[in-house]
Regions:
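Cofactor-binding active-site loop characterized by glycine-rich and histidine/acidic residues
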Residues: 1-106
């Protein structure tokens, strides 16, 4: 994931909702801590906030939630995010954008 996120994906860590940013869908939503760690390493989330994981007062839930600006779709059930990722990729083609969509499943 580190190689994909830091060597392959195109995004602005200070503007994760940039329309040309690549998309990453964590279809296995229970792997959200990995997503949070990647964004912390990129500088978007303060590393100290990673200890807030799964606290009631925290946005860093056990599964990704679109309340976070770097999450496009809430996921949970295995495979659920694949449909969202396919839709995102088809949308890129439809609007003639060159953003890429990646999906972590299984």
């Amino acid at each position: 994931m580190a190689a994909l996120f830091f060597a392959e994906m195109r995004f602005d860590p200070h503007n994760p909702q940039h329309p040309l940013a690549d998309r990453l869908v964590m279809s296995k939503g229970h792997a959200a801590p990995l997503l949070y760690a990647l964004w912390a390493e990129a500088g978007f989330i303060p590393v100290e906030r990673l200890t807030d994981l799964r606290l009631f007062s925290s946005d860093l839930e056990g599964h990704p939630t679109p309340r976070l600006p770097f999450v496009d779709v809430a996921t949970g059930s295995l495979g659920q995010g694949m449909c969202a990722a396919i839709g995102s990729a088809l949308n890129a083609r439809r609007i003639k954008s060159d953003y890429r969509t990646y999906c972590l499943i299984g």
